[in-house]
Amino acid sequence: KISKDLISGSVEVLKKHNIKKFSIIYSPGIFEIPYIISKNISSFDAFIALGCVIKGKTPHFNFISKAATDGIMHLTVANKKPIGNGIITCLNKKQAQKRSDPKKKNKGGEAAKAVLSVLGFFKNDRK
């Protein structure tokens, strides 16, 4: 539900800004997202990475979150393509639900807005 809500928030922003051609590529986990983006980097102008990591009782949360973020940043800089980071890192499920709520401040939508901003889709909105 959390990932689906992040996707919904992102898709809503894309459609609102008349982006009609986009693909949704699913990943088995957060750690695999940079690899999946790297395999598809030449096929798209930009990417929006979405997902959720909820902290457990081991340091695994920290390693996975950092690895995914570092991988995404490396791909962004190395390929000169924007990748919006909508991977939310939360302390519990309630926090994750709040940050992915489509009726509130959905982090998937925010990641989509960031990518569109970098691509220049908001030029007219700033006047």
Region annotations inferred by a language model:
Residues 1-28:
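Glycine-rich phosphate/diphosphate-binding loop of Rossmann-like nucleotide-binding domains
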Residues 35-72:
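Glycine-rich phosphate-binding loop
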Residues 23-39:
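N-terminal beta-loop-helix "entrance" segment that forms/cooperates
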Residues 105-127:
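A charged, well-structured terminal subsegment
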Residues 91-106:
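Phosphate-binding/catalytic loops
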Residues 62-89:
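Short, acidic/small-residue loops that bind anionic groups at enzyme active sites
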